[in-house]
Curated annotation (Swiss-Prot):
Domains: entry comment: Residues 239-252 form a flexible loop which appears to affect the polymerase fidelity.
GO molecular function, one term: damaged DNA binding
EC number: 2.7.7.7, 4.2.99.-, 4.2.99.18
Residues modified to N6-acetyllysine: K72
Matching PROSITE patterns: DNA_POLYMERASE_X
Highest classification ranks of the organism: Eukaryota, Metazoa, Chordata, Craniata, Vertebrata
Protein name: DNA polymerase beta
């Protein structure tokens, strides 16, 4: 998944950008995931609010905006800035950790370790490449490319190549490009592909080389340029569209391909389409109706709360039907 979130270009873009920056600080520096989730949820709700917010009190009427966040919104609206953020930006350690986590392959713990060793910038990383693992070296190599959002038009071209090449390998493959792209976003951080085949189910005693065959085909046509990691069921790598006739080169992009058992495929498609908040709301509704949902299965809960056997699922619609929830098209799941 991409580390770069799209900058907010809504009526309340200043507020949502502030909240996203606070969220990233809590995740990368403080490692307070509950605060990260709270800021993310508030930013998501405010991004869809159709009016310009004039006060913290107005924002507080929205679900997910509590007293503390409302107070920060008041301060931001009154002064155009936030003391807490100013302090974070001025703190060399915090800002360096936050920056280094933007490099693919560098998480908060690795970033803190690098900063403790005096490695704080891209230049520092380049001078200390011997301390980087393979994933981090690729992240550093393509840092500028990975920072760029992928326009939808480019994502559509990438999707065409991936789906066409997969069908060349075997017409029985089923593949879906998920993430914010499937929800209709104008730009994406990376490409997230889910793959399945009738020959692979959760009952399969061994995993056939279904994923490797697809990756090899995409390498053969020079779409996949680098491999970050490759297992039996998940590939993480780098891809690039072919150059234009005028010689213009497209940026390198992150791509993940996951192979999922056929009987678990649509639970996976639902989960990886998102959004995070939509998934949480759907799981909560499922529990109220006596079901538990995750990225693999939907299962009924018995009277003791123990989950039963997975239910058969042949489409996303089936999952909505089981929990008696109105079907939502992917474009309507960005809450």
């Amino acid at each position: 998944m991409s580390k770069r979130k799209a900058p907010q270009e809504t009526l309340n873009g200043g507020i949502t950008d502030m909240l996203v920056e606070l969220a990233n600080f809590e995740k990368n520096v403080s490692q307070a995931i509950h605060k990260y989730n709270a800021y993310r949820k508030a930013a998501s709700v405010i991004a869809k609010y159709p009016h310009k917010i004039k006060s913290g009190a107005e924002a507080k009427k929205l679900p997910g905006v509590g007293t503390k966040i409302a107070e920060k919104i008041d301060e931001f609206l009154a002064t155009g800035k936030l003391r807490k953020l100013e302090k974070i930006r001025q703190d060399d350690t915090s800002s360096s950790i936050n920056f280094l986590t933007r490099v693919t392959g560098i998480g908060p713990s690795a970033a803190r370790k690098f900063v403790d060793e005096g490695i704080k910038t891209l230049e520092d990383l380049r001078k200390n490449e011997d301390k980087l693992n393979h994933h981090q070296r690729i992240g550093l190599k393509y840092f500028e490319d990975f920072e760029k959002r992928i326009p939808r038009e480019e994502m559509l071209q990438m999707q065409d190549i991936v789906l066409n090449e997969i069908k060349k390998v075997d017409s029985e493959y089923i593949a879906t490009v998920c993430g914010s792209f499937r929800r209709g976003a104008e730009s994406s951080g990376d490409m997230d592909v889910l793959l399945t085949h009738p020959n692979f189910t959760s009952e399969s005693s061994k995993q056939p080389k279904l994923l490797h065959r697809v990756v090899e085909q995409l390498q053969k046509v020079h779409f996949i340029t680098d491999t970050l990691s490759k297992g039996e069921t998940k590939f993480m790598g780098v891809c690039q569209l072919p150059s234009e006739k005028d010689g213009k080169e497209y940026p390198h992009r992150r791509i993940d391909i996951r192979l999922i058992p056929k009987d678990q495929y649509y639970c996976g498609v639902l989960y990886f389409t998102g959004s995070d908040i939509f998934n949480k709301n759907m799981r909560a509704h499922a529990l109220e109706k006596g079901f538990t949902i995750n990225e693999y299965t939907i299962r009924p809960l018995g009277v003791t709360g123990v989950a039963g056997e997975p239910l058969p699922v042949d489409s996303e619609q089936d999952i909505f039907d089981y929990i008696q929830w109105r079907y939502r098209e992917p474009k309507d799941r960005s809450e």
